[in-house]
Amino acid sequence: MQIFLDTADIEAIEERYDSGIVAGVTTNPTLVANQGINYLELIQEIAEVFPEMESISAEVKGDTAAEMIDDAAKYRDISEAVTIKLPMTKEGIKACKYFSEVGVKTNVTLCFSVAQAALAGMAGATYISPFVGRLNDNSFSGVELVRGIADLYCTQAIETKVLAASLRDVHHVSRCFLYGAKVCTLPITVSYTHLTLPTTLSV
């Protein structure tokens, strides 16, 4: 059971990393670009500032598996912690299979069904990221998807870890861990409330 942070804010990562329970970071290049930050330099900085980080997800660009593999080259030499973030598409799965065969960690993202998670598992993904909050926005239960994927992986002895993403509140976090997620990646707003519950502070 691990906590990742879903942010590009180095100071926010430092503040929470000191707790000793943050094992990784997930990033979104679109949001990073909107902040005027160079994405490659950000990944390099995170790896330098937090050398013991287990996983730093770096999202690649490309419409084909070959393009994704080529784009990933600039991240692979940064650190062994770098995990290549791939889309849940046919080409993304092809790229995932390649990376698993050469020993590169992968995070297959934008997962919205157990069937998709099965494909990622068969391709050897290190992590699968079901988008809990995004599913809830469309009247589906994101935490139930987490449970379904975890059950599938357990039944079939698939080593891919469920990395619950798009978490909106602490209840999402608790239920995802309860239902079998190995990792929850928390936005900064959720990490504040998750790590500092008002009822605890008032005692």
Where do the PLM segments sit?
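Conserved anion-binding
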Residues: 53, 94, 108-161, 168-172
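Glycine-enriched alpha-helix->loop->beta-strand junction motifs that scaffold or abut catalytic
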Residues: 21-24, 78-81, 98-106, 122-128, ...
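Catalytic beta/alpha-barrel core
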Residues: 6, 57-61, 81-89, 105-116, ...
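Conserved, mostly hydrophobic/aromatic
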Residues: 28, 84, 120, 176
